[in-house]
Amino acid sequence: MSPVVLSLTGARKAFGADELFSDLSITLARGEHLCLLGPSGAGKSSLLRCLMGLEALDGGTLALADPAAGLGLVFQDFRLFPHLDALGNVTLALRAAQRLGAEEAEERARDALAQVGLEAFTHKKPGALSGGQQQRVAIARALALRPAVLLFDEPTSALDPERTAGLGAVLRGLTERGVALLTVTHDLAFAEHWADAVALLRDGQLTTPLPAARFFGPEAPAAVRAFLSPGAAPEEPSEP
């Protein structure tokens, strides 16, 4: 069994009197890809921001196996500097976040771009890249920091099926190298095909992560089946 790299226990987040989620726990193992599904407004993106420290949790404990490695986040609305080429975008972010010399930063940036299949596009500016290639630059930018866990917020929202498949292949390559992934998405097909495990965040509660085949199968919990096919799965009766 792969070692655990991230453990979130009993997390709670509220905005005033409105509780977004409570008693939420997640465990991620090295090289695991977990997808979180849920309706809009369920708190999925807020959860990612809390994990990154961009928002504060109102309760709970986050533990990382390697705090020095930390986490990386690829935003849904990522931005690249249009006047810099792919290598420059990654190198700039790396040098801003870590005190590296120019030579070491460039070497790590080239390695990150190679990991996402852009070694032949290092000197292309964003305007000369497709949307999918621009997204890979954003992934390389986060990957160059060498995080133990990468977080993705709706990574397929602007991609067509072909580019979505390309992204899935890139992410699978990362997990094969030991990077753990936590992806928030509305793309059911992406989660079913590319995730190792899938969980549902709804009404402030997170279901137990299940292997993708089981999550999307006929024996999934009633709450999951109701989300996937509204009206098709009645709630299971409670114990008397």
PLM regions: where:
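Conserved ABC ATPase signature
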Residues: 125-129, 133
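Conserved ABC ATPase "signature" region
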Residues: 102-121
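A short, surface-exposed alpha-helical micro-motif characterized by mixed small hydrophobic
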Residues: 191-193
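H-loop/switch region of ABC-family ATPase nucleotide-binding domains
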Residues: 185-186
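Catalytic Walker B motif of ABC-type/P-loop ATPase nucleotide-binding domains
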Residues: 150-153
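Helix-to-loop junction immediately C-terminal to a conserved catalytic motif
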Residues: 52
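A short, proline-enriched helix->beta-strand linker immediately N-terminal to the Walker B motif
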Residues: 144-148
